């Protein structure tokens, strides 16, 4: 199999979320010791680096046509990735704890396309069984989970069925809009007297507009100085009368 090294290096170190990552002990050869490596699982590719800060992977394992199983080895929490074939290599790995080993075994077992085909096949069988239920009408969906067949892997959780949609709420009637806008007079709307526009009591008519008054006397056309003098004389006369009334006992 020919692979593009630059594309694999970019895919191994990109910012996309990973399926699993952590330190594992990898056995180098038939009689070699274990080396601590940083492993990253993306899809069906298992990359391993010198450490977590490395920018280029040391190698990659394509998880197709393989099985993941527990093995007895010098290291505790060991498991192996075995490929079919007489000359196929077996990768022996070891985790740092029991929980880490179980997590890696589960993630690696679900990484291949064979597992996805199995899941799709089981779901298709379920769908065919539901559709061809002897011509009987399907019951209404209830808010509970459907049982899965025993052959389906335990990794798939049952999907809860959705409840039936609620009944539609009747729409409220919209207010009736007038067919024409009321006329305007000098930019102001005039109250309409027709009952079609306002069914309630008739509003009071607007007050009449005041018009500019025309001059009626000689003072209306007099200049300001003359007006000031005339009104000043009246004020002085009134003030004199008021002072004289105070002086008299």
From Swiss-Prot:
Phosphoserine: residues carrying this PTM: 213
Cited SUPFAM superfamilies: PH domain-like
Annotated stretches, region: Disordered: 134-159, 194-219
Compartments reported by the entry: Early endosome; Recycling endosome; Golgi apparatus, trans-Golgi network; Cytoplasmic vesicle, Clathrin-coated vesicle
Keyword Phosphoprotein: yes
Alphabetized GO MF terms: protein homodimerization activity
One Gene Ontology term from the biological process aspect of the record: receptor recycling
Biased composition (Pro residues): 140-152
One GO cellular component term: early endosome
Transmembrane segments: none
InterPro entries according to UniProt: Boi1/Boi2-like, PH-like_dom_sf, PH_domain
Sorted UniProt keywords: Cytoplasmic vesicle, Endosome, Golgi apparatus, Phosphoprotein
Motif (F&H): 223-235
Pfam families: PH
Residue ranges constituting the PH domain according to the UniProt record: 17-113
Subunit annotation: Forms homodimers and heterodimers with PHETA2. Interacts with OCRL and INPP5B. Interaction with OCRL may be important for endosomal morphology and function.
Entry's family note: Belongs to the sesquipedalian family.
Domain comment, as recorded: The F&H motif, an approximately 12-13 amino-acid sequence centered around Phe and His residues, is essential for binding to OCRL and INPP5B.
Other comments on record: Was named after 'sesquipedalian', an unnecessarily long description of a simple thing.
Record's function text: Plays a role in endocytic trafficking. Required for receptor recycling from endosomes, both to the trans-Golgi network and the plasma membrane.
Protein name as catalogued: Sesquipedalian-1
Gene symbol of the encoding locus: PHETA1
